[in-house]
């Protein structure tokens, strides 16, 4: 990444995620976008399900409960995927508008998984 782009990122600008509109964003890979990037805003919540022997379904169930509880913050783009931020994506407060204190953060606690 160029020094210029690093400076832009501290201001909240990612040149691969530019829409043709002044006030609005566009969906990922929509016609008219400049670049193939996208910006994600994250909100954290948790959903609770009973633990079973199917770790995949447990994860899907808890994710869906968290999303329907109150973590959903806007329209999802089902053209490509519903909820992801891949290598072309930019995460607000991590990739752009980053607070350097994030790098010093430690977990409140850790818990060993039984499986």
Curated annotation (Swiss-Prot):
Its lineage reads: Bacteria, Bacillati, Bacillota, Bacilli, Lactobacillales
Per its record, the protein catalyses: L-histidine + H(+) = histamine + CO2
Q: Please give one Pfam family short name.
A: HDC
Question: What is its quaternary makeup?
Answer: The proenzyme is a hexamer of identical pi chains; each pi chain monomer is cleaved to form a small (or beta) chain and a large (or alpha) chain by non-hydrolytic self-catalysis.
Cofactor(s) in the UniProt record: pyruvate
**What protein does this entry describe?**
Histidine decarboxylase proenzyme
Instruction: Show the GO MF annotations.
Output: histidine decarboxylase activity
Co-factor remark? Binds 1 pyruvoyl group covalently per subunit.
The record's InterPro entries line, in alphabetical order, gives: His_de-COase_proenz (IPR003427), Pyr-dep_his-deCO2ase_N (IPR016106), Pyr-dep_his/arg-deCO2ase (IPR016104), Pyr-dep_his/arg-deCO2ase_sand (IPR016105)
GO BP, sorted A to Z? L-histidine metabolic process
Keywords, A to Z, come to:
Decarboxylase, Lyase, Pyruvate, Zymogen
| Enzyme Commission number(s) of this protein | 4.1.1.22
Q: Which residues carry this modification: Pyruvic acid (Ser)?
A: 83
In this chain's numbering, which residues are marked as the site (Cleavage (non-hydrolytic))? 82-83
Organism from which the protein derives: Lentilactobacillus buchneri (Lactobacillus buchneri)
């Amino acid at each position: 990444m160029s020094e210029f782009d690093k400076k832009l990122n501290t201001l909240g600008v990612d040149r691969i995620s530019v829409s043709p509109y002044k006030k609005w964003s566009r969906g990922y890979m929509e016609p008219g976008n400049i670049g193939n990037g996208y910006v994600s805003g994250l909100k954290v919540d948790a959903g609770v399900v009973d633990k079973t022997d199917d770790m995949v379904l447990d994860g899907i169930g808890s994710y869906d409960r968290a999303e329907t509880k109150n973590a959903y913050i806007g329209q999802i783009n089902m053209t490509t995927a519903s909820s992801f931020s891949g290598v072309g994506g930019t995460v607000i407060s991590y990739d752009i508008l980053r607070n350097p204190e994030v790098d010093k953060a430690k977990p409140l606690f850790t818990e060993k998984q039984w499986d």
